[in-house]
Amino acid sequence: MRYLFNRSISSIPASASLAINEKAKAMRAAGKDVITLAAGEPDFDTPDRARIAGIRAISEGHTHYTESRGIRPLREGIARMLREDRGIDCTADNILMAPGGKYAIYETVRTLIDPGEGQEVMILNPGWVSYAPIVSAAGGVPVGVELTFEENYHITRQALEKVVSPRTRLLIMNYPNNPTGCVLSREEAACIADFALDHELLILSDEVYSTIVYDGAESVSPASIARVADHVITVNGFSKCAAMTGWRLGYICAPREIVDMVQMLNQHTMSCLSEFAMEAALEALQCKDETAAMVESYRHRRDFFVAGLNAIPGVTCHVPKGTFYAWAKIELDGKNSQEIADYLLEEAGVATVPGDAYGLGGTCCIRMSFATAEGDLREALRRMDAAIREING
């Protein structure tokens, strides 16, 4: 039988980071020694107190349907955290839970964009691999905002103005940034706020790495700027801050009218989250010491890993101020990012993500996670150094 599929879905490319991980697993299964730096996941387990809270909830029978918005104690806890830590003026009624930050982004874009109308969504380039496919799946048109390695990918009004049009509906931004590790300064946030107001745009601010910052850096939430707050949908979750990737716990914080409308999609596509997972998340909000310990461990690994990369001929890597990614530009006999990633995997046994997966701004760049065991990171540096020197000398 010939199956017919929705073109907006069938045209979506596979996730490059997941594809690389699968290839690395297959190589390992075939007996090859591969170090994986491609995963976007903390290498810590969920804090004990959060796990215990989830187990206790299951034992007490908290395994039934619950509110589609999410249990109120969790939404109140998230709102309190956003007020105190992110400067966002909100209440529990501004919070909507979702099965992961990725779905929170999809259902928000799906709610705001009219398919078939040619409505455009601006995304940072380079930017996370799933933004453009999500926009396309929702019926929108993704448009890249080109940022440069030379300027360390800092966002500018000029870059935004180059691509905005009368069809632009939404700007998706992500700080701290995956893949570059760049953070958003207060001046840059103010610039974006003015841009959104001048063009009457909404902002979707993905802040899933907001707790992972270094060297006293601050990554500002646009929703903390009062004059633009009613234009901002903030997306966050528990995957990165509390090492809860498998629990699938995300949320949006937005004006009540937007939350109410997105909830309609929630009700008809996923009903509600698991109550025991949400009770674990409620406890995770109290795990700030555990989060701080994770971040300090990432900082230590960042310091030696980035220094090691910059010691390799032909490799340049800015020191990331946030996330747990190193974004390196590699000059290797004219190879593009896919060819570089393939070479490192085949010749060095090191799995990385090619920069082209993050947009044209990723040409000749690769993303590597340093949320990996220190011994593996040091061995990966040794292998990459040897493989790159074979060509660069």
Language-model features: where?
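A glycine-/small-polar-enriched, mobile loop at the entrance of the PLP active site in fold-type I
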Residues: 38-41, 56-75
